[in-house]
């Protein structure tokens, strides 16, 4: 009995203790929440001093304005003005590309691999000037940087490590931010070689923060690519070449903190200290390879020269701010795709929830800019989805929803040790989310100006800084440019633009609205680099549990399965090169458009393994180079048509009844010149428009001429007014058709039947020789391109143009008239002929011909490393690929 009584007492006491702990925890949590939610009128930045708020001037603020690059004042060449916002040292780098300086050693005498405890911490302006003087006397020095991106919207450089033969220097770029230009001359000196590892981001970060431009660089990562090393990471080189192990998790530490821990100092020194020794070892290997390769005496095949060329190509990169049509639009589209369309269950998110996702993403973007915080520190993607689905109705519920979701997903493990979710921005501005959920701010255009005024207005709750001040000026411009098309309507087309203004309007309308290449990395499970790709592809792997995140800035993943093949094994070095968001022709970086070197009318009919996830033949061009390339392609199409005897346009279209039992809807007999066979959709529409509008008033000879043009399309039979109405819509997209119907002077008596054509015909206009270049670009923009073009076979990447868009031969059997438009039928017959007569080798030769046409027309000077005319394009499909034939069969 005594034992039972004691047990009861113990259980009772334990229960009371547990209840007390739970009560105290809940009390503290509620007290903290009340404290945080009750101080909504006060921003957390009034009590928290962020290191970057000590900067007196920033080159890249958080506004929507374009980043302005350094402009060099050269009196001798003032008349020859360089392109606005171009690379200030492009001339010097081009000289190095043509005449690389590699005849020197990275080491002087014997080198000890032991790293001493001695180093120099540079934190004053006088020390920085002394360092600049020391570096100016060096022939080579090593560089590395440490970044901070979590508590900053654009990120900033927190530390620069520089190593010479004698000493290691750690430069406190937070303390010296405003005077870092002191180092600009030594970094831009073409006579001094700067050694980096994986400098693609370091180069643009130095431009962003300090207007420091690297000229003459040797990148040990590029040397690894040329040598086809199994891994290209610095940790791998440190271990295999120097026998030094490093903890790469330290890269994610908060490099803003001062003083740095001993472990962080040693890590920072290690990255730069051994780079000179590693560079020397790799150049020795490159020279040995060049000696062994006796079959290629030409210097272009010299491995050391190739490594130098790739390194200096990296120097030409230019920093650009990511731009969007509207704040947060890219993030909201990605979230909706991943959590709705990407998983097929459309019941999870209603239309109202989708709109709330857009509002929250726009609000998150603006709050990140105002407070200089990364968007993930403001509000996580998972929290946005949770709020949009649950739509809590009180501030307490909103707070709990965010806290529980972030705790469950642990989306930011690096934050959990310091600050718990919800993060300070949410706690200070919880009322904004409450109003958005209640739909008190119904429109995005209303929401953002109100939030901006509340935060930065005359009586704003948030402090003004060098990072957010420009938002007050540029934000109205951003919103007005977003709304301009709706307000102006058709009036814009009535205005008389000068050539320059018209071109600027065209560029604004059709150029890419955000960087195409994100240069995210995918590694195989053995650590070898497979490819560079965009963020969406990384998310595809991560969401399916096929990969793990190994680096955050820039993002990199490692596959958890064995991929099918390696790029270097297949001779596809192109896919393991970083790509710059510039025109490959002239280097224009302010605007660019995607361009298909091999026209879609051919490529869409290629076998799957010769086109899927292949971006070798998709490049970026500015408007001027795009026009040159397109004109050359149109001329060459005519040569192809003559050579193969297959006309570009359908000679005539048969009734579906007549077509039954025939093997082809296109007449085989050709005229003397096959390029004149058939009717161009543009000429067809022009003739139909003239006949409908002025047919009764025009001279009989002209009327007959136009009738013959339309009759040729319909096979020579008599025409009805209904035929003319249908011809007027040939080759137009559904949007263009509706737009045409609204124009004055055009009425359709058979509008119901004509409108039905929108769903019956979907053709590719990509191949048409349109006089209006805008038509061409409309088709170009309808293509969603995989910007990675990776060498892996897994993942869905980005969508190719579907067959109904590209294939003019895709017809609906219900049509009373079968319509073959554009160059689709021509392309299909060409590819069928090549496969029938020459097999896949014929298709590859055909592709090489088109690449040569492109090179001869544009003379590209900025093509990515590894791009070549003789690229094979072949690939295999792995187990998880949506293009795997066995997988396709199993799903059908």
Swiss-Prot record:
Source domain of life is Eukaryota
Q: What UniProt keywords are attached to this protein's entry?
A: Cytoplasm
**Gene3D superfamilies reported for this sequence:** HRDC domain, Ribonuclease H-like superfamily/Ribonuclease H
Would I find Transmembrane helix among this entry's keywords? no
Q: Which gene encodes it?
A: RRP6L3
Domain 3'-5' exonuclease, which positions?
119-287
Q: Where in the cell is it found?
A: Cytoplasm, Cytosol
Where's the HRDC domain? 350-436
Q: Which SUPFAM superfamilies match?
A: HRDC-like, Ribonuclease H-like
Kindly state one GO CC term assigned in the UniProt record: cytoplasm
Q: Does the keyword Cytoplasm apply?
A: yes
Question: Which biological processes are named by the entry's GO terms?
Answer: exonucleolytic trimming to generate mature 3'-end of 5.8S rRNA from tricistronic rRNA transcript (SSU-rRNA, 5.8S rRNA, LSU-rRNA)
Q: Name one GO molecular function term.
A: nucleotide binding
- Tell me which InterPro entries the record gives: 3'-5'_exonuclease_dom, HRDC-like_sf, HRDC_dom, HRDC_dom_sf, RNaseH-like_sf, RNaseH_sf, Rrp6-like, Rrp6p-like_exo
Q: What SMART domains does its record include?
A: 35EXOc
Which segments carry the region annotation Disordered?
A: 785-811
Q: Which organism is it from?
A: Arabidopsis thaliana (Mouse-ear cress)
Spell out the protein name for this chain: Protein RRP6-like 3
């Amino acid at each position: 009995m005594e034992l039972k009584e004691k047990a009861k007492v113990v259980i009772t006491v334990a229960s009371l203790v547990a209840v007390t702990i739970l009560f105290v925890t809940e009390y503290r949590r509620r007290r903290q929440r009340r404290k945080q939610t009750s101080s909504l009128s006060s921003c957390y930045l009034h009590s928290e001093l962020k290191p970057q708020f000590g900067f007196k001037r920033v080159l890249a603020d958080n506004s929507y304005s374009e980043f302005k690059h350094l402009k060099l004042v050269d009196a001798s060449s003032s008349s020859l003005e360089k392109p606005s916002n171009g690379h200030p040292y492009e001339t010097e780098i081009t000289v190095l590309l043509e005449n690389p300086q590699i005849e020197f050693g990275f080491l002087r005498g014997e080198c000890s691999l032991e790293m001493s405890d001695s180093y120099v911490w540079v934190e004053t302006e006088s020390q920085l000037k002394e360092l600049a003087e020391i570096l100016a006397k060096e022939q080579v020095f090593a560089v590395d940087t440490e970044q901070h991106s979590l508590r900053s919207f654009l990120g900033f450089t927190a530390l620069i490590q520089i190593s010479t033969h004698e000493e290691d220097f750690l430069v406190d770029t937070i303390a010296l931010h405003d005077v870092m230009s002191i180092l600009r001359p030594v970094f831009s000196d073409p006579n001094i070689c700067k050694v980096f590892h994986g400098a693609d981001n370091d180069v643009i970060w130095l431009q962003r923060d300090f207007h420091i431009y690297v000229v003459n660089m040797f990148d040990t990562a590029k040397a690894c690519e040329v040598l086809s090393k199994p891994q290209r990471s610095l940790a791998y080189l440190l271990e295999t070449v120097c026998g030094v192990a490093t903890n790469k998790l330290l890269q994610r530490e908060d490099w803003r903190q001062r003083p740095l821990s001993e472990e962080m100092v040693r890590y920072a020194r290690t990255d730069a200290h051994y780079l000179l020794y590693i560079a020397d070892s790799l150049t020795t290997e490159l020279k040995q390879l060049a000696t062994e390769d006796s079959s290629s005496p030409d210097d272009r095949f010299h491995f050391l020269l190739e490594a130098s060329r790739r390194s200096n190509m990296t120097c030409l990169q230019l920093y650009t701010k990511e731009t969007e049509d509207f704040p947060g639009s890219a993030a909201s589209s990605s979230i909706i795709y991943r959590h709705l369309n990407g998983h097929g269950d459309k019941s999870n998110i209603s239309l109202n929830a989708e709109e709330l996702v857009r509002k929250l993403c726009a609000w998150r973007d603006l709050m990140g800019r105002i407070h200089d915080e990364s968007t993930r520190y403001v509000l996580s993607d998972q929290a946005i989805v949770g709020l949009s689905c649950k739509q809590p109705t009180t501030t307490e519920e909103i707070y709990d929803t965010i806290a529980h979701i972030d705790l469950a997903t642990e989306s930011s493990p690096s934050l959990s040790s310091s600050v718990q979710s919800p993060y300070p921005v949410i706690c200070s501005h919880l009322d904004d989310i409450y109003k958005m959920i209640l739909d008190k701010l119904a429109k995005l255009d209303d929401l953002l100006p109100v939030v901006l005024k509340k935060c930065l207005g005359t009586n704003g709750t948030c402090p003004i800084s060098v990072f957010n001040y420009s938002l007050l000026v540029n934000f109205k411009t951003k919103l007005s440019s977003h709304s301009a098309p709706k307000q102006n309507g058709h009036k814009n087309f009535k205005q008389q633009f000068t050539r320059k203004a018209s071109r600027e309007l065209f560029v604004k309308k059709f150029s890419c609205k955000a960087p195409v290449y994100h240069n995210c990395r995918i590694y195989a499970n053995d650590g070898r680099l497979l490819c560079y790709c965009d963020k969406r592809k990384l998310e595809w792997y991560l969401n399916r549990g096929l990969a793990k995140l190994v680096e955050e800035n820039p993002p990199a993943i490692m596959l958890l399965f064995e991929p099918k093949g390696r790029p270097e094994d297949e001779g596809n070095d192109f896919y393991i090169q970083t790509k710059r968001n510039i025109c490959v022709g002239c280097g224009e970086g302010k605007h660019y458009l995607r361009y298909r070197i091999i026209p879609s009318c051919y490529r869409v009919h290629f076998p799957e393994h010769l086109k899927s996830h292949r971006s070798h033949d998709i490049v970026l061009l500015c408007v001027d180079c795009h026009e040159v390339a397109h004109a050359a392609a149109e001329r060459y199409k005519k040569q192809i048509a003559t050579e193969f005897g297959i006309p570009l346009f359908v000679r005539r279209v048969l009734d579906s009844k007549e077509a039954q039992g025939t093997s082809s809807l296109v007449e085989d007999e050709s005229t003397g010149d096959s390029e004149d066979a058939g009717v161009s959709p543009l000429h067809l529409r022009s003739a139909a428009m003239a006949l409908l509008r002025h047919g009764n008033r025009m001279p009989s000879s002209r009327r007959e001429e136009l009738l013959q043009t339309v009759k040729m399309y319909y096979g020579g039979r008599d025409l009805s007014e209904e035929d003319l109405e249908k011809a007027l819509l040939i080759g137009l997209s559904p949007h263009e058709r509706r737009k045409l119907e609204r124009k004055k002077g055009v009425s359709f008596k058979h509008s119901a039947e004509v409108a039905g054509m929108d769903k019956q015909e979907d053709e590719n206009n990509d191949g048409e020789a349109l006089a209006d270049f805008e038509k061409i670009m409309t088709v170009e923009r309808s293509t969603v391109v995989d910007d990675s073009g990776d060498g892996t076979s897994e993942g869905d990447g980005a969508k190719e143009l579907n067959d109904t868009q590209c294939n003019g031969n895709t017809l609906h059997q219900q049509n009373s008239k079968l319509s073959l438009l554009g160059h689709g039928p021509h392309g299909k017959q060409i590819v069928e002929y090549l496969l029938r007569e020459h097999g896949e080798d014929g298709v590859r030769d055909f592709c090489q011909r088109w690449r040569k046409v492109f090179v001869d027309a544009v003379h590209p000077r900025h093509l990515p490393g590894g791009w070549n005319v003789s690229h094979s394009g072949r690939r295999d499909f792995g187990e998880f690929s949506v293009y795997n034939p066995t997988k396709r069969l199993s799903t059908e």
